[in-house]
């Protein structure tokens, strides 16, 4: 798509989204566009600090859990002593960026609104880790906490997965992995998916949307994919292109959230339409005027707060 033919996204977004886009952090250095991945990760962590201020306080513990790839960091948020379920949160960042700190406020709000224990899993980033390592680490963490639930004072009889962007793909892929390989980590009561990518190679929204403002041009998306996958054949794996998995049976209830001006929006629409066509429990909600990654900005955006609350309420309704 010739850039001039794309939608003028920054003219169309909501007033509160424009406020976020125009918010300057004076102490923040320029984005290291030509820097190393390590430098970009450092910048991303620094930039997200501002947006994580003011999150709900609650008991929080950090643990390392064993996997076949080595230990993986986790962070547990306890909103109350007797939680009805446990939610595993997988952060976004194109598989190459992000950590438990960049998504701390999101996890705290989700724990507060759901009153469920939330466990963030700091899966190994790409390109150091290639598909399907992140999924296998997530599954290993789930199994570990299922076996040690009493020691960590968590309720693993009912669990869920949640994630944003690349984390949404990992959330659903992990749930399908447990189903397909018949791994018992507790009943998967629901999956919460905010503006994920699920396997489309091209779409209307991928053509009309995406730019320097969201880091989701076609070139960006290709770069994330090449960093994450081990080889070309992985593009068709049912745990990367989730539309190649069996979505006609035993899919946990899915809350699917879309951002209006997100190039990945058609992934969410197709996922919803596929699940609904096969009578799999699901709900789709579009958040008008928003860009990809808007969930981070609940400090300024009521819509971001609403989207987290909607997901939390969907999950608790499944319990």
UniProtKB/Swiss-Prot annotation:
Keyword terms: Cytoplasm, Hydrolase, Serine esterase
UniProt-listed PROSITE patterns: LIPASE_GDXG_HIS, LIPASE_GDXG_SER
Pfam families: Abhydrolase_3
GO molecular function, one term: carboxylic ester hydrolase activity
SUPFAM superfamilies per record: alpha/beta-Hydrolases
Subcellular location: Cytoplasm
Keyword Cytoplasm: yes
Enzyme nomenclature, EC number: 3.1.1.-
InterPro entries the record matches: AB_hydrolase_3 (IPR013094), AB_hydrolase_fold (IPR029058), Acetyl_esterase (IPR023508), GDXG_lipolytic_enzyme (IPR050300), Lipase_GDXG_HIS_AS (IPR002168), Lipase_GDXG_put_SER_AS (IPR033140)
Main localization of the protein described in the UniProt heading: cytoplasm
Superkingdom field: Bacteria
Motif (Involved in the stabilization of the negatively charged intermediate by the formation of the oxyanion hole) on chain: 91-93
One GO cellular component, as annotated: cytoplasm
Residues of the active site: 165, 262, 292
Function: Displays esterase activity towards short chain fatty esters (acyl chain length of up to 8 carbons). Able to hydrolyze triacetylglycerol (triacetin) and tributyrylglycerol (tributyrin), but not trioleylglycerol (triolein) or cholesterol oleate. Negatively regulates MalT activity by antagonizing maltotriose binding. Inhibits MelA galactosidase activity.
Family statement: Belongs to the 'GDXG' lipolytic enzyme family.
PANTHER family: AB HYDROLASE SUPERFAMILY PROTEIN C4A8.06C (PTHR48081), ALPHA_BETA HYDROLASE FOLD-3 DOMAIN-CONTAINING PROTEIN-RELATED (PTHR48081:SF8)
Quaternary organization: Homodimer. Interacts with MalT and MelA.
Name of this protein: Acetyl esterase
Organism encoding this protein: Escherichia coli O127:H6 (strain E2348/69 / EPEC)
């Amino acid at each position: 798509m010739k850039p001039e033919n794309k939608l003028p996204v920054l003219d169309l977004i909501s007033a509160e989204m424009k406020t976020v886009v125009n918010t300057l952090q004076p102490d923040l250095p320029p984005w290291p566009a030509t820097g190393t991945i390590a430098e970009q990760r450092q910048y991303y962590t620094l930039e997200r600090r501002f947006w994580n201020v003011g999150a709900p306080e609650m008991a929080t513990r950090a643990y390392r859990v064993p996997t076949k790839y080595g230990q993986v960091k986790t962070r547990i948020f306890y909103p109350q002593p007797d939680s009805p379920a446990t939610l595993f949160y997988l952060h976004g960042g194109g598989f190459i960026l992000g950590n438990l700190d960049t998504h701390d406020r999101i996890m705290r709000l989700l724990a507060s609104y759901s009153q469920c224990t939330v466990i963030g899993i700091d899966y190994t980033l790409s390109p150091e880790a290639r598909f399907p390592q992140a999924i296998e680490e997530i599954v290993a963490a789930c199994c570990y906490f299922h076996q040690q639930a009493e020691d960590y004072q968590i309720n693993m009889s009912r669990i869920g997965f949640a994630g944003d962007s690349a984390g949404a793909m990992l959330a659903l892929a992990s749930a399908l992995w447990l189903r397909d390989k018949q791994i018992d980590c507790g009943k998967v009561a629901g999956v919460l998916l905010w503006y994920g990518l699920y396997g489309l190679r091209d779409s209307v929204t991928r053509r009309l949307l995406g730019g320097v403002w969201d880091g989701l041009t076609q070139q960006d998306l290709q770069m994330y994919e090449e960093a994450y996958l081990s080889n070309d054949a992985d593009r068709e794996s049912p745990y990367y292109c989730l539309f190649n998995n069996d979505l006609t049976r035993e899919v946990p209830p899915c809350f699917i959230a879309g951002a209006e001006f997100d190039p990945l929006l058609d992934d969410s629409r197709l996922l919803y339409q596929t699940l609904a066509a096969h009578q799999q429990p699901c709900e789709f909600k579009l958040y008008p005027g928003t860009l990809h990654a808007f969930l981070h900005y609940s400090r300024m955006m009521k819509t971001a707060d609403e989207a987290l609350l909607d997901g939390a309420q969907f999950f608790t309704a499944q319990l």
